[in-house]
Regions:
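Extended alpha-solenoid helical-repeat scaffolds
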Residues: 1-562
């Protein structure tokens, strides 16, 4: 063998033969080889370029929040093109830019005389280009189905903040006539489909319809029978998330006309309590839920929205909710053998009590406004009738009107502070002492759902009455400091912020206790604390007394959002 003889081993590659082969190649073959090499180089450079684009996506997402308008517009255009070419991460930018809908839409003139379009109008153009413009080669029905699917898919995995911004965007687009009527009808078909479609599709359809109804209340008002039959009927009873979004859609039936400052008139539509809608709403609240998944969040979400709908749409919501609380109280305290269900029913009752109390306070404010509106109308009529005989001076009329409004305001304030939670005939007063007792006895009532509901209701009760707030403020601060449940601590922080808005002096005296949440190990508690403190400080509701260092530490936090 060659290894034994010491002779060098011959290479398997014959270089001479290779050179001879290259020399023998024809001119056409040589050109083909060069073209293949150039093509390979082109693809390599293209891949490098794509990787560089993907690396720049996170930076461009941050530029969407830039104070430089030109940078924002260029970033939006990049994500529009990148999304069409399916660049990895482009969908993150398209999803992030939706919050720009809240930007003030003012055109900007550059130094060269060119004019930059407003950010909000440009955002509408980008979304129309990506999800609404017709694709070439599609029929009319295929285009409508594609637009419908694109709109529904925008709700998949969306956060609450994203859904809020999406609602503002789609409502503006609908107000401008960019959403075709055929698309709306297709969304209703998906929502009411008798076929076993996915839950996400049906939920997405009613979410989009609810968003569009913000600009056109008739869109859901005309289909109320469908809402009651599907979302509050047999389908919604098995899918409480669908029922929740159906209740949100019902809220738009009343109309979204905002009250103009200085006026008394309101534009909400209300229905008699005999309307079948209220029977369905009460039924969805009272229906017992023993499913483990429903216990975590779904039932509480649908109950909250159902109560909101009752108070917004009903002519006498307090009477209906009184009967609702009586039925739930009897069910919670009825003797059964299933101890677990008893505790969960108690948690449901406590939650409903708290939210009814809060909505009743808002209802009293509406009643006060209605009293003032009717009195203003009577005064106008009386002034017109007596104007010819003995006209009164403007100052005299203003004094009388102001005195009457003060009397009405004082009466309502007394009812709110003394009657709702302390009145001898008040149903809510029965739970005024029960809720703090549950919160302060975690060993006796260890159920996590009951504790969360009780803490939330305690916060709502404290926003109603100054006397109740002062009596239980120490307990709420104690929960914020010692509770082992991060959800209870997070809700306690938000509750303290709400209490500070209602009764600022009480919280300002204990503001240093609020800063403790900035050092909480749970990210949700920390974010809620920072959000509440930012709101209270910027609006002058609490004073900073040497705690700036605690806020400055947040700049070094590992979490970028903090």
């Amino acid at each position: 063998m060659s290894s034994r003889s010491g002779k060098p081993r011959r290479s398997g590659l014959d270089l001479d033969a290779l050179a001879a082969t290259q020399q023998s190649m024809t001119h056409a073959e040589h050109e083909k080889l060069v073209k293949l090499r150039l093509t390979m180089t082109y693809y390599e450079d293209a891949l490098k370029f794509i990787h560089l684009l993907e690396q720049g996506v996170p930076i461009l997402v941050q530029l969407l929040a830039s104070t430089n308008k030109a940078e924002v517009l260029e970033s939006m255009e990049f994500f529009r093109v990148a999304h069409e070419y399916k660049i990895h991460g482009a969908s993150d930018g398209v999803r992030a830019m939706i919050h720009l809908i809240w930007t003030k839409d003012n055109a900007l003139v550059m130094e060269d005389g060119s004019q930059l379009k407003g950010i909000r109008s440009r955002l509408i153009e980008v979304y129309r280009s990506l999800y609404f413009d017709p694709y070439p080669g599609l029929s009319r029905s295929e285009h409508v189905a594609l637009v419908c699917r694109n709109m529904i898919e925008r709700t998949f995995g969306a956060t609450l903040a994203e859904l809020t911004s999406l609602e503002q965007l789609f409502s503006l687009m609908h107000a401008e006539g960019l959403v075709e009527r055929a698309v709306v009808e297709k969304l209703w078909d998906v929502y009411a489909s008798p076929l076993p479609i996915s839950r996400a599709q049906r939920r997405g359809a009613i979410m989009i319809l609810s968003m569009l109804a913000k600009a056109e209340r008739e869109l859901v008002a005309e289909k109320m029978d469908v809402l009651l039959r599907i979302g509050l009927g047999h389908v919604g009873s098995k899918d409480l998330v669908l029922a929740k979004h159906t209740c949100i859609a019902l809220l738009h039936v009343s109309g979204s006309t905002k009250k103009v400052k200085g006026t008394l008139a309101g534009g909400h539509v209300r229905y008699p309590m005999q309307h079948p809608m209220f029977t369905r709403l009460c039924s969805i609240i009272e229906t017992p839920s023993t499913d483990e998944k429903d216990r975590h969040s779904e039932w509480f979400g649908v109950a909250e929205q159902a109560i909101d709908a009752i108070y917004l749409l009903g002519e006498q919501p307090d009477a209906l909710c009184t009967e609702l609380l009586r039925h739930m109280t009897l069910a919670a305290f009825a003797s059964t053998d299933q101890r677990t269900n008893d505790v969960y029913q108690m948690a449901q009752l406590v939650f409903v009590v708290g939210h009814v109390a809060l909505k009743q306070m808002v209802h009293l404010e509406l009643v006060e406004r209605e009293f003032k509106r009717r009195k203003a109308m009577r005064d106008d009529v009386a002034q017109q009738n007596s104007g010819a005989s003995k006209p009164a001076t403007a100052s005299e009329l203003d004094q009388v009107a102001e005195q009457a409004e003060d009397d009405i305001g004082e009466t309502m304030a007394w009812v709110r502070d003394r009657e709702l939670l302390y009145g001898p005939e008040s149903l809510l007063a029965l739970y005024g002492n029960v809720v703090p007792f549950i919160c302060s006895n975690t060993r006796q009532y260890p159920d996590i759902f009951l504790q969360r509901a009780a803490a939330l209701t305690l916060c709502k009760f404290m926003c109603i009455s100054a006397e109740y707030c002062e009596a239980n403020l120490g307990l709420l601060l104690h929960l914020l400091r010692t509770s082992k449940d991060a959800v209870v601590r997070a809700n306690a922080v938000i509750g303290l912020g709400d209490v500070a808005v209602c009764f600022g002096t009480l919280v300002d005296e204990n503001s240093e206790r609020l800063y403790a949440g900035l050092g909480d190990k749970d990210l949700g508690v920390k974010k809620n604390t920072l959000m509440v403190l930012t709101h209270l400080i910027l609006n002058g509701m609490i004073k900073v007394k040497g705690q700036l260092g605690e806020l400055a530490k947040c700049l070094e936090d590992e979490e970028m959002r903090v």
